């Protein structure tokens, strides 16, 4: 039986290090002897229910850890379920009952260290590179046991489409990228070419070959296939490591890149520069025959470089980019790989690149910035020294990425511990029932205090192209180390709330100096346009986006500014100003003026705001309205709020709720769910947005209708149903935030009960 372990790690191991006693760490362990017959039956029932409904609801309900936590805490919902009949008014008591039921359930799924665990996955390309890297290094069998393999295969079977393929993400249509990666994972885990549940391998292979074969995989896939020996490096775009030796102000230096893009390019440029290829095993030779539509030794690698399957092509390469690739391929790279440049320049560039890889690994305790980068950095360390300490430290941190759900084993981005906790605590605080949920609040407060980043990246971080991180909060845990603006703003809001509550209930308030450090970090990221970036200050030319080589993602070359991050910062600073009016007062006031102007400028023609990190216009609009409301803007004095209200009211469905398709994200146009269905998360976001906009003072009917749907959707134990996927990054890659179905409905119910007049 699988069990989630929290805040644990081998403190005696020389290969793992923690900055705060592993607070926030969440790892899964399999115990073949654990679990009663009843507990095992519960887990199996959850798996079977997911399988039966897998084509209707793609994201898992995250039941494996929830069943464990509810069982360990002996949770029983004691508040009777409530429903609102047609024509019936929602009373204060009804709203209170629904809110308390949600709050008590949510408190019960809190971890012992105070954070809220959850799945944060969804893309089908997260897991396979871990398999690839471990296969190449010979550690696949030791890291992924038979129990792991069963869950990986369960995940692949559950998310295979009826046409045999897999999408870029779990809700997307079949793609070459997702299908090739999933097929290779099954084969490397030991399945034969015609094995797998429901003939999984044969169906996948047919989809690949019917769509042109593996030469049509996007560029990221071409890189990994070259590493595996299923492609030739001659069929990929050049990634010369010499770019790391350019002056950092040079437009094409990686320092100008968005941090995730920079840290993918970093190990890839090392592996490309060495032309590294893993062992050509009999299985690799067989896979060459299975995946290519012509004999491997007859493929014209130069001609396949620009190929991309139609289902994967979201961002076609501009002509200028193809010219750059061809110049590097035909002129630059042949020079760099011949004597004397290969001896003096290339070797020096490889050493410089590896030095930066080691720096980034050490700064993140070998977690790295994310799951795409992790297996590449781990492999680069192994290529440099198969017996080296760096590689062994990487192995110790693989567990930090693994997540088990009723749909199987997947790989996380890197965990959303702090983000989910900061939002969830605000939802609980809005309930105003401190006496009932005091222990959950106290533990959450303690977690946030321990999760704040206390130091900057190690050593001379500026020469390694890093922004300072001291005082920030991360998306995941403190060990991860990567500062995030909206996570900092939301965590700061929580700490400020807690400072106004009795210490005997929620614990000692956070040290003001630590709060000042958080404020300083947020201030450092405001752009000249007034908006806030996420990780590092924006400022590189947006023209560099023309060089985006990733065919299925957009806006990933340079750092941008975002409405959601800016709105979160506005709310945090307005609150901070009231409690600490003297710290950088003038700078905060200037920040707020520019930030409000930025949000107003970013509003779309239909009155909504595009959501960069959630689906999509409803998500962005909720955050934007929260920021404008905090800044003192109202329906009467702000045209942007009036236009936003009009958008929300027009988007309301006949059942009283709201529901938006993930397709809004890539299309950048509001698209409702099929049949104008509603979802509890979108309904909650819209209700919160309308409350921010003062709709209750004008006509509360739309809010009542939305809350009625929330109350009637609540499950018997206080949970809410899992529905569509709700997160996104880079326009076209969706993320499953499993806690959103609890956090936002709870928050909406709490604000509704506090701010909308209701009959007793």
Swiss-Prot record:
One of its GO terms (biological process) is triterpenoid biosynthetic process. CDD domains: SQCY_1 (cd02892). PROSITE patterns: TERPENE_SYNTHASES. It catalyses: (S)-2,3-epoxysqualene = tirucalla-7,24-dien-3beta-ol. GO terms for molecular function: beta-amyrin synthase activity. Pathway: Secondary metabolite biosynthesis; terpenoid biosynthesis. PFTB repeats lie at residues 99-141, 149-190, 441-485, 515-560, 592-632, 641-689, 703-744. The active site is at residue 486. InterPro entries: SQ_cyclase_C, SQ_cyclase_N, Squalene_cyclase, Terpene_synthase_CS, Terpenoid_cyclase/PrenylTrfase. Mainly expressed in petioles and roots, and, to a lower extent, in leaves. GO terms for cellular component: lipid droplet. Its EC number is 5.4.99.56. The keyword Cytoplasm does not apply. It comes from the Eukaryota. Keywords: Isomerase, Repeat. PANTHER family: BETA-AMYRIN SYNTHASE-RELATED, TERPENE CYCLASE/MUTASE FAMILY MEMBER. Oxidosqualene cyclase involved in the biosynthesis of limonoids triterpene natural products such as azadirachtin, an antifeedant widely used as bioinsecticide, and possessing many medicinal applications including anti-tumoral, anti-malarial, anti-rheumatic, antibacterial, anti-inflammatory, anti-pyretic and diuretic effects. Converts 2,3-oxidosqualene (2,3-epoxysqualene) into tirucalladienol, generating rings and asymmetric centers in a single transformation. NCBIfam families: squalene_cyclas. Belongs to the terpene cyclase/mutase family. This is Tirucalladienol synthase OSC1. The lineage of its organism: Eukaryota, Viridiplantae, Streptophyta, Embryophyta, Tracheophyta.
């Amino acid at each position: 039986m699988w069990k989630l372990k929290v805040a644990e790690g081998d403190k005696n191991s020389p290969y793992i290090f923690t900055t705060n006693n592993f607070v926030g760490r969440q790892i899964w362990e399999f115990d073949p002897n654990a679990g009663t017959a009843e507990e095992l039956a519960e887990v199996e029932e959850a798996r079977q229910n997911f399988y039966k409904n897998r084509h209707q609801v793609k994201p898992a309900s995250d039941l494996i850890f929830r069943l464990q936590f509810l069982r360990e805490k002996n949770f029983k919902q004691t508040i009777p379920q409530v429903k609102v009949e047609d024509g019936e008014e929602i009373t204060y008591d009804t709203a209170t009952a629904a809110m308390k039921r949600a709050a008590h359930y949510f408190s019960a799924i809190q971890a012992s260290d105070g954070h809220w665990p959850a799945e944060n996955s969804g893309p089908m390309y997260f897991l396979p590179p871990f398999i690839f890297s471990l296969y190449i290094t010979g550690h696949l069998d030791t890291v992924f046991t038979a129990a792991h393999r069963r869950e990986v295969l369960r995940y692949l079977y559950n998310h295979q489409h009826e046409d045999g393929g897999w999408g870029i993400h779990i809700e997307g249509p079949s793609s070459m990228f997702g299908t090739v990666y999933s097929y290779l994972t099954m084969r490397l885990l030991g399945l034969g070419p015609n094995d797998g549940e429901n003939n999984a391998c044969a169906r996948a292979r047919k989809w690949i070959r019917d769509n042109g074969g593996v030469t049509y995989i996007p560029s990221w896939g071409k890189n990994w296939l070259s590493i595996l020996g299923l492609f030739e490096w001659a069929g990929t775009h050049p990634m010369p490591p010499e770019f790391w030796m350019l002056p950092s102000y040079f437009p094409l230096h990686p320092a100008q890149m968005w941090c995730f893009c920079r840290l993918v390019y970093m190990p890839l440029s090392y592996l490309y520069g060495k032309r590294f290829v893993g062992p050509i095993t009999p299985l690799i030779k067989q896979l060459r025959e299975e995946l290519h539509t012509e004999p491997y030794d007859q493929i014209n690698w130069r001609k396949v470089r620009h190929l991309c399957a139609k289902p994967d092509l979201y961002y076609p390469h501009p002509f200028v980019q193809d010219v750059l690739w061809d110049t590097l391929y035909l002129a630059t790279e042949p020079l760099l790989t011949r004597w004397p440049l290969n001896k003096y320049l290339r070797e020096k560039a490889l050493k410089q690149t590896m030095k930066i890889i080691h720096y980034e690994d050490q700064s993140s305790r070998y977690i790295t910035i994310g799951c795409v980068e992790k297996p590449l950095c781990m492999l680069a360390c192994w290529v440099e020294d198969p017996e080296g300490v760096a590689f062994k430290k990487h192995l110790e941190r693989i567990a930090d990425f693994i997540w088990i759900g009723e749909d199987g084993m997947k790989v996380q981005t890197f965990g959303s511990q702090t983000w989910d906790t900061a939002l969830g605590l605000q939802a609980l605080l809005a309930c105003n029932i401190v006496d009932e949920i005091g222990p959950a609040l106290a533990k959450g407060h303690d977690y946030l205090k321990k999760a704040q980043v206390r130091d900057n990246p190690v050593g001379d971080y500026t020469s390694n192209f890093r922004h300072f991180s001291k005082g920030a909060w991360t998306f995941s845990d403190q060990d991860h180390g990567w500062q995030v603006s909206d996570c900092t703003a939301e965590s700061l809001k929580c700490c400020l709330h807690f400072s106004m509550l009795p210490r005997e209930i929620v614990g000692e308030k956070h040290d003001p100096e630590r709060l000042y450090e958080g404020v300083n970090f947020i201030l450092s990221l405001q752009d000249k346009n007034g908006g806030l970036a996420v990780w590092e200050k924006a400022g590189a030319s947006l023209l560099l986006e023309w060089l985006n080589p990733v065919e299925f993602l957009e806006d990933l070359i340079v750092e941008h500014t975002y409405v959601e991050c800016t709105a979160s910062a506005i709310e945090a600073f307005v609150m901070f100003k009231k409690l600490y009016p003297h710290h950088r007062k003038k700078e905060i006031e200037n920040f707020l003026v520019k930030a409000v102007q930025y949000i107003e400028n970013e509003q779309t023609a239909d009155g909504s705001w595009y959501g960069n990190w959630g689906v999509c216009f409803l998500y962005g609009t909720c955050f934007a309205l929260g920021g404008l409301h905090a800044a003192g803007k109202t329906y009467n004095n702000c045209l942007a709020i009036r236009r936003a209200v009009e958008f929300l009211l027009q988007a309301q469905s006949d059942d009283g709720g709201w529901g938006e398709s993930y397709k809004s994200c890539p299309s950048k146009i509001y698209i409702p769910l099929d049949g104008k269905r509603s979802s509890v998360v979108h309904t909650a976001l819209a209700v919160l947005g309308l409350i921010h906009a003062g709709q209750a003072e004008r006509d509360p009917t739309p809010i009542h209708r939305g809350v009625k749907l929330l109350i009637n959707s609540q499950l018997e134990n206080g949970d809410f149903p899992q529905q569509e996927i709700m997160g996104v990054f880079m326009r076209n890659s969706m993320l499953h935030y499993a806690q959103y179905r609890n956090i936002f409905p709870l928050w909406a119910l709490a604000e509704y009960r506090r701010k909308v007049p209701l009959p007793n």
